Amino acid sequence: MDDQQLTIQQIQQLHMLLQQQQQQQQQQQQQQQQQQQQLQQQNFQLTPQNFQIPVNNNNNNNNNSNNNNNNETAFNITSQNNSIAANLNNDTNIINTTTTTTNNNNNNNNNNNNNNNNNNNNNNNNNNNNNNNTAPNQKFPTRKYKKQKDKLAELGIDVELSKKPTAAVKKKPPAKKSAKNAASQPTSPTLSTTNTSSAFTTAVLDTKKRKNQELLDYSDNSEESDSDEEDFENGDNENGDFPGGGDRKNRRLLKNREAAQLFRQRQKEYINSLESKASSLEASNTTALSKVSHLTEENQLMKDKVRYLKNFVKQAVSISLPMSVVNQDNINNLNNNLNGLQNQQNNNNNNNNNNNNNNNNNNNNNNNNNNNNNQNNFNNNNNNNINNNITFNNNNNNNSNNNNSNNIDSLLFNLPPD
């Protein structure tokens, strides 16, 4: 019973100590918060020479007391933790070995898949090469088409060649008027004259349209005959399909497509050349304008110098003349000119000095801003370090309190009953 009473007294003492420690920690936290607020209010500037991280002696003393109190109760816990850590290490080693084996298997599978894909790509390339080798001979556009295209390119006309005109559908002749319709129409002389004139004009228009259509058909037939002759000469009639219409049309369509592509390419090249010329002309224009501005400035300077030299010449002439010839008006004019020159020189010097002063002020302001930024960064880093130290101490204190409370609970649980 005496031993039990002693243990209970010790536990009560430990409870009291824990309560005191918690109160002290709360006070320390409040003090730290107050210090942070004061630092933020003051916005003081810290330098690396006079900066020293403050050390709380109270925290160290409390930590030492806590460590002394916890050393007695932590022996059992450390032994248990060591056994648990050993088991965990064994489990982690087993898991790592299994993961490495699975990763190796996955890598091997990926390599096999990549090899298969490469083989398939090689086979596809070989098939494409074979197909290209067995492809028919390339078709070229007709000579007339090339000539027309070259003429347009030489003239610089960016117009695509029109397609071949489709065969116009011939209109059916108007149906003959029946006897009833003829009888129903009036027989006045004015209407008869208008009908005859309209019929004559329609007949003339029909004849003109027919002539134009015949000319178009003739040109189409001539081009088709030329292209067919070229196809026959080039050996395109391999299957003996020259008399047929389908293969010949397909050939003609292919040639027209290729010719159109070539014509578009030439158009693009011509446009690109024009753009390059325009850019070069713009560059030369800018250089010429800069030269002109420079020459105008030099011209103005020369004019000013000539004007000043005229004044000096007048002054020299007046000085060389006898005093009887020199008038007071001439002397006053010369003095005014000299004063004007001196004033202009003084103004130029003042402007240069002002510009230099402004540049120096700007440089000083930039340097001051950089220094302020560096000091602010340094202050922020120091504040962050202080906060990190405070949080670290708080975490350590909390961990120690939790361990003490756990140990006390375990002791209370292990006490024998009364």
Swiss-Prot record:
Residues 246-309 form the bZIP domain. One of its GO terms (cellular component) is nucleus. It comes from the Eukaryota. Residues 8-47, 324-362 form a coiled coil. The keyword Transcription applies. Pfam families: bZIP_1. Probable transcriptional regulator. This is Probable basic-leucine zipper transcription factor E. It comes from Dictyostelium discoideum (Social amoeba). The gene is bzpE.
